[in-house]
Amino acid sequence: MRKSIMIFSLLLALVVVLSACQPSPQATQPPAAQQTQPPAAGGEPVEISFMAWGAPEELAVWQKIVDEFQAANPSIKVTVEVSDWTSYWEKLKTLLSANTPPDVFAMDAPLYLDYQSRGVLQNLQPYIDQNPDLLKDVYPVTLEAYKTPDGYYGLPRDFQTVVIFFNKDMFDKAGVPYPQPGWTWNDLREAAKTLTQDTNGDGKVDQYGFTADLWDMELTWSEGIWSHGGEIISSDKTKTLIGSPEALQAWQLFYDMMWKDKSMPDTNTSGQYGLDLFQAGIAAMTPIGHWVVPGYATATFKWDVAPMPAGPAGQATSINSAGFVVAKGSTHPDEAWKFIEFVLSPTGQTRLTELGLAIPVLKSVAESPVFLKQKTVEINQQVFLDSLKFAHMKPVFKGYDEWSAVVGDGMATIWTGETELEPTLNDVVQQADAVLAKNK
């Protein structure tokens, strides 16, 4: 018996030694091929962290998504943190500087290259190559912002197209026809004039036909420039083109609506209200994205949405997305990828759509009742999808954050009435070009 045990022990030792000399099957596979295994009895699941910006109510939705993910993947535990926009980016920069980043974090598409070029993001292409069907149902235009020569370092989770929100009650009372497909900027301007009124009879305008955020390009002026045949930035990302003759036509339109027609409040006037002028029932029209729908659903007036108007070069709108990235410093990239896969699945996309803030990137979900027949409010959701036909991707380039601040802050004095349009615009273009040169 003792001899049998000794022989068995020697054989077992030999097997262990031989096994140790052989390469691990996982070691010879790309990262995406490594499969997360259920924890052993009594073992602890792998913990990963996920950070995103958003309103407090979004945390509950993300937690629901996480709960469903964990039920399907008991070997992984996800902790979720949702912060407001400013706090989110400040904390993210601090964590990256300390080399303690969240495993997965949300990314605004225009800022993507600033992070990707710093080498702080994991290349997701090996994972995608292992699941080539993953992106087949994703709207192609939403992927454009995340492409790089060596693959994707991020993927979109949802997107926004900008449309015109309009107050049906104001239109009805003023006898103005609702916006129709194919309408123009001239149509919008004339409607805005009629809808701008002194409803109290005290000689002061208290109802505006149109209001818009002119600081960032996404909501108004990029659409205006594209529809007039202009561009925002050159294809090689070295020249700012917002001062071209075509672009100037769009700027002049907004300038005249504000200072000549008085149908659009200047920055000082709108700032006095301290409110969303459309939601407060002070403005009849505003261009904005789907993220306002849950908030606007509580409005006491009837409203709907219409496509952006056409200019001399046709219709145009902006498309932007929120995406996912995995930190290069993550110690659990495989598990982080599994979470992204789940959010991009029909189940994950359905849960995000139920929140009502954005448009799902999966066609099968976006073009289903899940999106088109949302319960929050009865509006023409199809307009957001139809706008893809003439949508331009919001530009993505290195130095975007600094460039947009130079443009937004530089043009701000025009909308307060402190400076003239053309000389200010020319100065801004020079400053913006300097940012591009610095980030080339």
PLM segments and residue spans:
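Hinge/lid segment of periplasmic solute-binding proteins
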Residues: 41, 109-163, 186-187, 224, ...
